[in-house]
């Protein structure tokens, strides 16, 4: 019904109507994987935690390793996957739509806040490198566990990094802090299929 409604109301949407059922609870599960709270209003508007302990204190010890089965919403995600498959009973292909899409910069901005992360670049650049490296490593570990759990092969990945645009960051910041992490993701997945941001990426290319 959702796909038919989308087709009827958004004719310019060129996404194919496939005979499968995505098992999804919402967008933004990655924030919960790294310890942030995520809430939705009755209208479906998300609110992401802005007062994580790391927002106040640039201490890497405040972050715990991500556990594929137990971190954040993952227990709910996996229960939902099992429940949907039980209901469908093989009549449709069920796809897991709750994946780690967000990039390292997006998560770092949410953990520290934009203003504080930009100050960190000048006052404690090694901390910024460590934070982005940690988030990238956790993302890759999560995808490795995801592929093993669902019996899938790793493939080129998509990345959503809303702050990956000028003037919020400079080409120099991207080159020195973010690009090395993207290259690690590219190596791990054997490619990057697409990168989404909410602004102008052209000066970064």
Where are these regions (language model features)?
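Active-site beta->alpha loop and helix N-cap motifs at the rims of alpha/beta catalytic domains
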Residues: 25, 46-57
């Amino acid at each position: 019904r959702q796909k038919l409604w989308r087709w009827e109301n958004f004719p310019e949407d060129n996404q194919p109507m496939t005979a499968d059922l995505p098992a999804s609870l919402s967008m933004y599960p990655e924030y919960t994987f790294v310890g942030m709270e995520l809430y939705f209003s009755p209208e479906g508007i998300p609110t992401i935690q802005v007062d994580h302990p790391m927002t106040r204190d640039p201490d890497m010890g405040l972050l715990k390793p991500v556990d594929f089965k137990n971190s954040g919403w993952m227990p709910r995600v996996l229960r939902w996957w099992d429940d949907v498959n039980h209901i469908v009973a093989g009549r449709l292909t069920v796809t897991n739509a709750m994946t780690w899409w967000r990039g390292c910069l997006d998560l770092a901005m949410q953990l520290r806040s934009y203003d504080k992360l930009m100050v960190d670049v000048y006052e404690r650049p090694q901390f910024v490198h460590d934070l982005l490296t940690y988030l990238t490593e956790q993302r890759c570990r999560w995808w490795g566990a995801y592929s093993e759990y669902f019996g899938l092969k790793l493939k080129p990945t998509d990345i959503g990094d809303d702050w990956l645009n000028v003037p919020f960051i400079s080409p120099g910041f991207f080159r020195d802090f973010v690009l090395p992490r993207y290259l690690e993701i590219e190596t791990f997945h054997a490619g990057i299929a697409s990168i989404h941001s909410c602004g102008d990426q052209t000066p970064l290319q």
